[in-house]
């Protein structure tokens, strides 16, 4: 399944607030479609699927990528759900979003893909790069790159930079000073349901 490029508010109407996907708020509180206002009892599978979709759309990853992250999370020590969230939080595109270089995760990914971002002084255009403690993420020394980042920093997607990231606004750079913790994930999600969803599939 490829990355979603359709109407974003349609997704937030169905799944709720997704800060990584869009800043806009849905005007209608019920899901889209002809039967959106109908009250139906959802099955356990539907609830788990919805939580999985939240994760996929918020972080902008494909189904194949998410399966890969679930396998990695299982191989690590500790809670699979927490490990999964940490892996997604440490993606370069998400880190750029969290520090305000991009207005959304897709916006931050475009910044990375177009070569506007450096990691430890080297241009890195791989959005899935796993940031680790000690990494310095900065905007490339080009006028167009700086203008883009400065414009986005004036209106960041989220109000607070998480404590494991240290932003230096004047230098347009940030340092990863620790590990992403569960409590600083901006998305409202039950990651255990995502793990349960994949328990028989992966």
From Swiss-Prot:
Gene3D superfamilies in the record: Ribosomal Protein S4 Delta 41, Chain A, domain 1 (1.10.1050.10), RNA-binding S4 domain (3.10.290.10)
GO biological process: ribosomal small subunit biogenesis; translation
Keyword rRNA-binding among UniProt keywords: yes
Gene Ontology CC entries for this record: small ribosomal subunit
Keywords: Ribonucleoprotein, Ribosomal protein, RNA-binding, rRNA-binding
Annotated S4 RNA-binding domain residues: 90-152
Ribonucleoprotein among keywords: yes
Assembly: Part of the 30S ribosomal subunit. Contacts protein S5. The interaction surface between S4 and S5 is involved in control of translational fidelity.
Its biological purpose: One of the primary rRNA binding proteins, it binds directly to 16S rRNA where it nucleates assembly of the body of the 30S subunit. With S5 and S12 plays an important role in translational accuracy.
Protein name: Small ribosomal subunit protein uS4
Gene name per UniProt: rpsD
